[in-house]
Amino acid sequence: MSLDDLIAMCRAKLAHLSQLRPSAVSLGDTEQVERIDAEAIKTQQTLNQLLTLA
């Protein structure tokens, strides 16, 4: 798997998480919102690290 593939995967995951979050918010599922936010933060940090290598 190339660096570009990993970057694309991180971007796709962030896009997916950003689509999931509004549903969790509207349902009032604060635990799910917190999990989504935590996963988004980890994914963004990984993406930032990958971009410094690119």
Regions from the PLM with identified roles:
Residues 1-10, 30, 48-52:
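N-terminal targeting/docking segments
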Residues 2-20, 36-40:
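Short amphipathic alpha-helical heptad-repeat segments
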Residues 22-34:
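Charged, low-complexity interaction regions
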Residues 40-54:
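Amphipathic alpha-helical coiled-coil segments
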